[in-house]
Amino acid sequence: MKFTLNWLQKYVDTTGLTPTEIADKLTMLGLEVDSVAPIFEELAALKTGLVISCEKHPDADKLSLCQVQVGDDTHQIVCGAPNVREGLAVTVALPGAVLPGNFKIKKSKVRGIASAGMLCSERELGIGEDHDGIMELPEGMAHGQRFIDAMELSDTFIEVDLTPNRPDCASVIGTAREIAGKIGRPLQIPVKDRQIEAESRDFSVEVESSELCPRYTAKLIKNVTVGKSPWWLRKLLVSVGMRPINNIVDITNFVMLEYGQPLHAFDFKKVAGNKIVVRLPRENETEITTLDGTKREISAEMLLICDADKPIAVAGVMGGANSEIDAESTDILLESACFNPVSVRKTARNLKLPSEASYRFERGVDPGGVVNALDRAAELIAEIAGGALCSEGIDNYDGKKAVEVQRFSISRTSSLIGVEFSGEELTAMLTSIEMVVEKDPENEDILLVTAPTFRIDIEREADLVEEIARIYGYDNVPTATPLVALSYPEQDDDRLKRYPLALKLTRIGFNEAINYSFVTAQHADMLQLSEQDYRRKVVTLLNPLSEEQAVMRACLLPSLLENVKRNISFQKTAVKLFEIGKIFLAQGEDVQPIERQCITGVLSGNKFGESSSLYFKSANVDIFDAKGTVEFILSEMGLTDLANNEKIEFTVPPEGAREPFSTQDYALTIHLGPNVLGTIGKVEEEVLKSFGIKHEVYYFDLNFDALCALSPQTKAFSSLPVYPAVKRDIALVVPASISAGELLATVRSSRDKLMEYAEIFDVFEGGKIQKGYKSVAVSITYRSQTKTLTEKNVEKSHSKIVSLLTDRFGGSFRDA
């Protein structure tokens, strides 16, 4: 809804309020203000002038050489307008002024004659479409004034974004009513409480469906003169972005904006049979040419306004070209009606013809205000276009609805808003927005409220409470701290571990995946699970969205493998994903499934990521990357050393205990004593094929709930080492069946007092290494807490560890 501050001022006195304050009050009333801005500021540099002489240009028949007085100065201006003449008050753009469209005025020569400015037409000023001549200002207007001051164009534009439940505010009067109620000032309405006194005999109206057209009113105005609208009317329309057309059409548009009631004017001489019929199309009526000159197809459900022979308008949307007002029209049939909102909405959408009228009809117009708008427009037409005004007309109101009275509790309203109101205060606020309020003779706490017909959103007591809150002011409601007993949620220790761990995994190159808990039942077959595997017993959904989401997942790995396939299809050369989520293990009918939280990860492609240097392009992930990630997880969770000196171990599972989707050569079980905490491995090629993956994929799968339940060993802190460390590397060639982890565990179990740390840094097969054997390289750090080690001290401890490895594993050593 668009209006200006000066227009609003015609209906409610806003003296003392700035545009910003008015916008704030509208916002607090629940009307969202989109914009507040001054208008016609681009015309501020223009002046009023007086043509004191006008002569023909010596070198051009169609140009005039004018002397124009602007204040104390006289300017010579060459003008080509046919209506320029001596004594004419004009709008002058002097050099330096900028017209709409960024047209800069400069001193120039026109056919050899100097011209110091421009006399402007309405189109050049952006306030109309007339370009046949310059704009003629009122006779006797003082020259030298600012044009926007002289023509009262200086104004503020306000645009309000209305919600669908407030069609009453799709008018300037409706908005003024809200402001008046808020600031406690009277509302001035030009025409109200009108009724059609007598039925006209000059024409007839027939409405075939009162459901589609609850009310239809019309008046005939004779002997009008169609012409240009007066300046005040054109100015108001232009200020809100509407194009003036002629006095009749401009009046209907003005009243629509003023009252929120769309109107339409027919040329009565073009209405066959002097009859209006509101009906649906006949079988042979398939198209109509609307006012914009476009032929439009009409369908069977579109409501039409017809004369005795043919359709002459699409109800609530647009008039027909066969009955439009033109310069020759003298008798006007003025329509003011109420159409079904749903019907108008469908018609406007189907015709792709939104309009200001359909905008209001779609939201619902006031059936009680139809005659007020009709009379207001009729009076303006008689005043401006010289028509003969008569009181007769036709009012077909077959769709009138019974008035509903709402019971309104004073005490409940006070309780809900938090302010103690009296019945008199509530009555004053409601009557300020034109509601009728009476006391209930049987109950002092109850007011009987009748909402006006334009408030279609008032349906129950809660709506009235909202009206009181709006008018009183939400910002005036006192704030009070609610007395609520606070309860703190139980601390989720697992969650406190989950988030930091996920964050740290992303920092070492992983991406977190969050997949649906609903998966396909085919996953068990794709993983090659045995018939006895507990993960085949799934929780089935009663109403799945699709077959792809028919069961609850019993394992996180399948969804991650689908993620791998998708990433590879997008040319990702390095994929590292993990997910921390729940799996659901069925326990039989009528028994809740076990929910277990797991952390599962997959690794495929380049070891160092897509941005790795050329040197590392061929380095792909292997089982040690998966194992290293698990060790990182255990370390970050503080589970490297457990209470009671327990240790989490990695072992090669026996053949029957290996995961069916893991290869035989690359499989590890993670356990704490007899309890299995998870597995690591390389996914079988056949399993990968079932997921459409052609690249190697390594995985880890851990019971996160079980890990969170473990108690880490209390850390014992010692002072920082003072003496330097000595590193020695050894490489042992052993049978390929011996795991590197077993060899490392042997080194660490030596318990040599000088050995501080040991780690494997290389495992190598092939080359000069005998087939069936591999080289395992171990780095050992030696340090003393009391002295600097000598070569002799280190050699003694190192030899001891070498002997230990030789005795246990055999093989040969090579000093690294």
UniProtKB/Swiss-Prot annotation:
EC number: 6.1.1.20
Cofactor annotation: Mg(2+)
Catalysis performed (reactions): tRNA(Phe) + L-phenylalanine + ATP = L-phenylalanyl-tRNA(Phe) + AMP + diphosphate + H(+)
A molecular function (GO) term: tRNA binding
GO cellular component labels: phenylalanine-tRNA ligase complex
Cofactor annotation comment: Binds 2 magnesium ions per tetramer.
Residue ranges occupied by any tRNA-binding domain in the UniProt entry: 40-148
InterPro entries: aa-tRNA-synth_II/BPL/LPL (IPR045864), B3/B4_tRNA-bd (IPR005146), DNA-bd_dom_put_sf (IPR009061), Fdx_antiC-bd (IPR005121), Fdx_antiC-bd_sf (IPR036690), NA-bd_OB-fold (IPR012340), Phe-tRNA-ligase_IIc_bsu (IPR045060), Phe-tRNA-ligase_IIc_bsu_bact (IPR004532)
Highest taxon above the source species: Bacteria
FDX-ACB domain location: 721-814
Keyword Kinase recorded: no
Subcellular location: Cytoplasm
Binding site for Mg(2+): 457, 463, 466-467
B5 domain sequence ranges: 401-479
EC top class, as a word: ligase
Any one GO biological process: phenylalanyl-tRNA aminoacylation
Principal place of residence: cytoplasm
Keywords: Aminoacyl-tRNA synthetase, ATP-binding, Cytoplasm, Ligase, Magnesium, Metal-binding, Nucleotide-binding, Protein biosynthesis, RNA-binding, tRNA-binding
Subunit details: Tetramer of two alpha and two beta subunits.
NCBIfam families in the record: pheT_bact, YtpR
Family: Belongs to the phenylalanyl-tRNA synthetase beta subunit family. Type 1 subfamily.
Matching PANTHER family: PHENYLALANINE--TRNA LIGASE BETA SUBUNIT, PHENYLALANYL-TRNA SYNTHETASE BETA CHAIN AND LEUCINE-RICH REPEAT-CONTAINING PROTEIN 47
Protein's recorded name: Phenylalanine--tRNA ligase beta subunit
